Amino acid sequence: MDMTNAQRLILSNQYKMMTMLDPENAERYRRQQTIVERGFGLQMRELDRDFGEMSEDTCRTIINIMEMHHALQVSWGNLKEKQDLDERRISFLGFDAATESRYLSYVRFMVNTEGRYTHFDSGTHGFNSQTPMWDKYQRMLAIWQSCPRQYHLSAVEISQIINA
């Protein structure tokens, strides 16, 4: 990320204000402030990720993943015979903060800002699954989208989806 000294000063001041406005993430903002002030090239690349772009297709895929989990929860709730299905297995875990931070950020935006899927339990880590989930969700989506009644899933269909 190439910035003039004036741009770096402005961004540094923004991070300083954020430490005061958001004490929970103050340490992260202090670190970013130091990186910007001192112009550490390697770490400045990290900031590029914060200002990255997410394609419309990726956004739609994440919404589809969240909608699939909503359908799983609705279907599970409607089952008369739950068989061996564990309710925790149908919960939406989110994405891995270390490797899927953009996806995680979009989920948090959808829930906290847009007010969608607020019934999902964000857990103690705010939808940070702490393990990569993208590939698993893709397999689950493929099975869910092939089901004829996506919001009236049988126990067998739910099991197939969560075991994908």
Curated annotation (Swiss-Prot):
SUPFAM superfamilies: YfbU-like (SSF116960). Coiled coil: none annotated. It comes from the Bacteria. Pfam families: YfbU. Belongs to the UPF0304 family. This is UPF0304 protein YPO2563/y1624/YP_2374. It comes from Yersinia pestis.
